[in-house]
A protein has these predicted regions:
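Conserved S-adenosyl-L-methionine
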Residues: 21, 28-101, 180-219, 225-228
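Conserved phosphoryl-transfer catalytic core
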Residues: 70-138
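S-adenosyl-L-methionine
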Residues: 1-36
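SAM-dependent nucleic-acid methyltransferase catalytic core
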Residues: 125-228
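Hydrophobic (often cysteine-bearing) scaffold residues that line and stabilize catalytic clefts
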Residues: 17, 21, 72, 124, ...
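Short, charged/polar micro-motifs that form catalytic or ligand-binding hotspots
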Residues: 11-15, 66, 118, 138
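Short linear capping/connector segments at secondary-structure termini
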Residues: 5-7, 109-114, 166-172
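Alpha-helix initiation/capping motif
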Residues: 13-17, 117, 173, 177
Length: 229
């Protein structure tokens, strides 16, 4: 049965291919508990962007997951945490202020990267490098830095020459890439609204690793339920 409740906004903070419906996780947990299985820890060994991670911690349970894709684990970690909005606002204000005065280093190796030059024009390379640099400069708390890096990651496609509606890498010769700063402001504010939906709930904890499950040494069973795809 399809759930009556809509998916939380947190599931939409970053584009990611082949996401499955969030309710599969909660249905699996409920089904296991109906069959007298005590579910304290849920795992997703190909955790992707963290659909299972978010729904698990929302249920007040512990999550363990891994993926070899660093972008996937960044999104999953961001989704499965709750942030103080006042602290987000403070860091965000400082990022914007620093961005407006920061000068990029034209000797940075990024300018000699052929693939970067292929996807981005020089103005967008300048502004994206500036934004990424000030995120690392201003946000000294790694927990919050991941939130702002996740927002940065999600604007890259719209600020590039990549065909907007295509999952496969494809140049759109007619595309006008979006402005970096306005795109980032919109993205962060959207993510803050998503975070506010979760602010007063008691969440479980998530343990997310960037690794291949085949490389993980498991001495004994440590999870009660695996939900993966």
């Amino acid at each position: 049965n399809m759930p009556a409740e809509r998916e939380r906004r947190m599931h939409s903070i970053h584009a990611y291919p082949a996401k499955f419906p969030a309710f599969i996780t909660t249905k699996a947990i409920h089904k296991a508990e109906e069959n007298n299985i005590s579910v304290k820890t849920v795992a997703d060994i190909f955790c992707g962007c963290g659909t299972v991670a978010f729904e698990t911690v929302r249920s007040g349970k512990h999550f363990w997951g891994c993926d070899i894709n660093p972008v996937a684990t960044l999104i999953a970690e961001t989704k499965s945490n709750v942030y103080q909005d006042g602290q987000l606002q403070d860091f965000f204000d400082r990022i914007i202020a620093a961005y407006k005065t920061y000068s990029v280093d034209k000797s940075n190796h990024i300018y000699s990267n052929e693939r970067i030059q292929y996807w981005f024009d020089e103005e967008h390379i300048d502004n994206l490098l500036k934004l990424r640099s000030v995120i690392y400069l201003v946000v000294d708390d790694e927990f919050y830095r991941k939130f702002f890096l996740c927002a940065f990651s999600n604007i890259l496609k719209s600020c590039s020459r990549w065909l907007t509606k295509s999952i496969k890498p494809q140049i759109d010769p007619k595309k006008q890439p979006k402005d970096v700063l306005s795109s980032y402001i919109y993205q962060v504010n959207m993510m803050r609204r998503a975070n506010m939906e979760n602010i007063n709930e008691k969440y479980g904890e998530a343990d997310i690793k960037r690794t291949n499950i085949l490389d993980v040494n498991i001495d004994k069973p440590f999870v009660d339920l695996i939900v993966t795809s």
